[in-house]
């Protein structure tokens, strides 16, 4: 169902300065290039300013500087991208689940499901689980024993929570995510791997989002902990006993080994890997495909590996890398020979 909201109502909702008719009706959102005469757009990135003049949008979210000289209707705000984020929820077409339990769902007798929660078809809620008001549990979800889901959470179809997972309020978990699976713990005795029972749980804070097919393993002893406001993209692996600080965000395919601690307000780009038992301080940005092998104690941006280059150049560089040891030995020999004939005997490349 398409929402229709007047421009004046949007201005009031955002606390924006309205330039244009408050009665103009907005039915959706679109980019500057694609917006039609009933859609709202926004300009947040300067590289798209070239599309502003010819945009057919009904109105545009703009900073004050960009609004100068713009002839169309506008909502003037300090941060157009943040304003767009807030408005997007007003036009979200995602179906709203009705409260109640689907007849095909299986609910343990001692599970507590608030009447204002929604439990979808073929969902399973095991013994001792507690589901708060406003929670949506999608079709075919599994909620293990003694799990807790705080108010207004949303679980897409086919989410799995193993036993003893505690989730805060307003948490979003996408399809295929598995929370509380057994951590990868084994003791080796004479070449034979002996399984270690993973007796901890998972603790997830408020306002967390977890993407499609992401795995958060339960702790070996203490809980694996995901802080408030953490955002995890698709296909991320969080190993046992990992701790992630508040408002840290990770892009797809990040892998974090066991017992690593990540601070608050960090950003990990796609494909980052971290070894186990290290600490990452607050306010760290790690670029894509970086391999983190030791603790980071200072805020800032960190990278590893080589940047993209034409394949022929990369092959030459790779060949030279294999020769580095030999080149270092030859350089040392040359330094020694030059040092033998240099006054003072100092021919080091460091001198």
Curated annotation (Swiss-Prot):
GO molecular function ontology, one term from the record: N-acyltransferase activity
Cellular component per GO, a single term: membrane
Organism: Pseudomonas fluorescens (strain SBW25)
Top EC class of this enzyme: transferase
Function: Catalyzes the N-acylation of UDP-3-O-acylglucosamine using 3-hydroxyacyl-ACP as the acyl donor. Is involved in the biosynthesis of lipid A, a phosphorylated glycolipid that anchors the lipopolysaccharide to the outer membrane of the cell.
Positions of the catalytic residues: 240
Pathway(s) it belongs to: Bacterial outer membrane biogenesis; LPS lipid A biosynthesis
Signal peptide: none
Similarity field: Belongs to the transferase hexapeptide repeat family. LpxD subfamily.
Protein EC: 2.3.1.191
Name under which the protein is recorded: UDP-3-O-acylglucosamine N-acyltransferase
Keywords linked to the UniProt accession: Acyltransferase, Lipid A biosynthesis, Lipid biosynthesis, Lipid metabolism, Repeat, Transferase
Superkingdom of this protein's organism: Bacteria
Catalysed reaction, written as an equation: a UDP-3-O-[(3R)-3-hydroxyacyl]-alpha-D-glucosamine + a (3R)-hydroxyacyl-[ACP] = a UDP-2-N,3-O-bis[(3R)-3-hydroxyacyl]-alpha-D-glucosamine + holo-[ACP] + H(+)
Gene Ontology process terms (BP): lipid A biosynthetic process
Subunit structure: Homotrimer.
